Amino acid sequence: MLVVVLIAVASSLATFALRDPSSTQLENEAARLASLLEAARAQSRATGIAVRWEPRPVSPDTEGFRFVGLTPGNELPRRWLGEGVSAEIIGQPALMLGPEPIIGRQRLVLRLNDQRLTLATDGLSPFAVAAEETPQ
């Protein structure tokens, strides 16, 4: 009887430990986008050409986002890994990625269903997942 109870408790704990797949997908999208933004930032500094990142509307006809200003042959991916991901830049239409070493404070919110993640930089540090800002 004790063994049955232990198995029931262990399986209920395992059920609680399972993660939401959309949350994992959004975390993967955020990590990938942060890497792409830093790659574009490095290319911008290396070439001395201003590069910006713009999200695109969610539609079967458009790509998920685009990098404007990259030199030919140095293009980066323009699609999300999965369907339904969208991005919104806070306070401006595009992220400015250089060529200056300090680019200014910038934030964007990634969304997938009811999940949200914020990527941000203080202008000197790389883009990374950040805590949500609460209005005061």
Q: Language-model segments: which ranges?
A:
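N-terminal helix-rich module
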Residues: 1, 9-42, 46, 50, ...
